[in-house]
């Protein structure tokens, strides 16, 4: 956020105490011991007999030997996690979600930590065969007990806008007007527990002229480049995986929006440790991902909004640390709870303070409230969110929400008294209505609020993804990594579609209110823009497969009312997004 004001009579922030330092270290050690504990139980479980000791009965760790259990069916075996389903292959991800709601795959994966992974027995071919029996994919080059080499599907993605930039969840594409395309593909190699996926992407962007304002938009040069894309190197350690990756990620239950991690921006190099399967315990099952990496900016490209432009030239690297934990209670079979927390700060400041390793490099383990550390004096940004997803098997439906804060609370009193400050949310509902075994109707609705609330009249928080401590905001290569509808925007989406295997025909309506609150010239006395920019989008969505070609297309007509907040400036924008997957 750009302006921070303490609540009236808010006590001054306390200096960091030695006890506070030990709290962060304690949290980190506890987490590491937890990982070692269930890893030990996994290894020892392989040598135990059928009889359980008192320890097994009390703790009853049942680490899933089948990492892709959520894709299980009565006649399919699940081995170790391997090839990824890239975030961006939204059609395959959507169909996996539909199969889970329909009860055709097990509900023990929250689907809130992606990318998802196939494996040696459930290959792309078998997964696609579950989706549609007519789809074939023969991608294996070498298949031996300890060696697997496979070709990855080739995807050719195209995007076109006719008036101004529009669209989201498009990875390496730039925020520009005109025609863009991306080609991706590669090879996957598995040797024992080592898994290497090389999936580079070639992208060519556009540079069409369009009407901008001093506040929104920027016409920037086009570029063409080869990027690492959806590549990774992974090594399995029982139920854990350590990895280096440039893959896009998606955290949270949303279909169109994720508050903290989506493929709205290009992926970035990160190092992670994560569970490679749902981990069953006496209290329920857990999944997690802990990661760290560096975010980048591109001096040749613009930002969506002037509030994200670096106001000060800063050549320091931005260090990024985040964690996502998903929990499915033992007593609530179809309910999933999630917690996500992220930090970013400049590396040149890490060595200039004496707060210790945990505070500087794994701050996701420090206390949640800011009165433990003097965060407002440190150039860094933290964001946190909680989520829930509830599957209704009999209704073949689900409800979900994500609620978060763009700024950490001062203390528990601050949390209780000013819940709306810096808050945002995503919530949605999805329902399937089956016509027969393979044909069904899909209904889904999703709403997101990322503009700050009217509480800013008392205590300005700025919109989501901006912060005075990190001048580039929550971005990578100048694009927001979280919510997709735009900076400070509110969004509602409604979709209805007919499905038959892979094939799909549907309609989507989206309503976007562009940054309705802001402290800029021209607003009225209560801080609400006198002229509101609103987009109304009407679209056709379709999927079709022919032999080894999987085609999906999204075509929308967007009517912008008061574009760039200019009265009676109402252009029409056409948007086309076509993704073609070539199988082997």
Give residue spans per PLM region.
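Core alpha-helical transmembrane segments of integral membrane proteins
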Residues: 184, 191-198
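Exposed, low-structure sequence patches enriched in small/polar residues
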Residues: 45, 226, 328, 333-584
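Outer membrane beta-barrel
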Residues: 194-195, 201, 205, 222-297, ...
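Short loop/turn motifs that connect adjacent beta-strands in outer-membrane beta-barrel proteins
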Residues: 106, 143-145, 189-193, 236-239, ...
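Bacterial Sec-dependent N-terminal signal peptides
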Residues: 1-49, 584
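Primarily recognizes Gram-negative and organellar outer-membrane beta-barrels
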Residues: 143-177, 204-227, 262-264, 279-285, ...
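N-terminal periplasmic/intermembrane-space "pro-region" immediately following the signal or transit peptide
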Residues: 2-3, 14, 42-177, 188-192
